Amino acid sequence: MKDFYYETTYILRADLTEEQVEQAIAKYQTPLTEAGAEVQDTQHRGKRRLAYLINKQREGIYVQINYTGDGSQIAPLERALRLSEEVLRFLTVKQEVRPPAPVAVEA
């Protein structure tokens, strides 16, 4: 079966502590790895102001996960995100081509 490249971005409530955010990131990687996906990269994008109120929240913590899989891994992840009260919104997109690997920049 052919693997495709996916990117899931989700927004966590801004009132979570850094420890709770790290636990949430680990919690949402688990359904992916259990279903056979290979997590390529996880980026904690930080706290940002939302364009409009979502569940009475003005700010959210953005997290992005890039992973490969055959597509069957998306449903368990999105189910976990949908049922969680700490997640405000999420979006999964299928990438057409593999994103380039991040290049280290020398200072």
Curated annotation (Swiss-Prot):
What Gene Ontology cellular-component terms does the record carry? cytoplasm; ribonucleoprotein complex; ribosome
NCBIfam families membership? S6
Q: Which cysteines are joined by disulfide bonds?
A: none
Q: Which GO terms describe its biological process?
A: translation
Source organism per entry reads: Synechococcus sp. (strain ATCC 27144 / PCC 6301 / SAUG 1402/1)
Alphabetically list the UniProt keywords: Ribonucleoprotein, Ribosomal protein, RNA-binding, rRNA-binding
Could you identify this protein by its name? Small ribosomal subunit protein bS6
Superkingdom classification of source = Bacteria
Listed GO molecular functions?
Answer: small ribosomal subunit rRNA binding; structural constituent of ribosome
Q: What exactly does this protein do?
A: Binds together with bS18 to 16S ribosomal RNA.
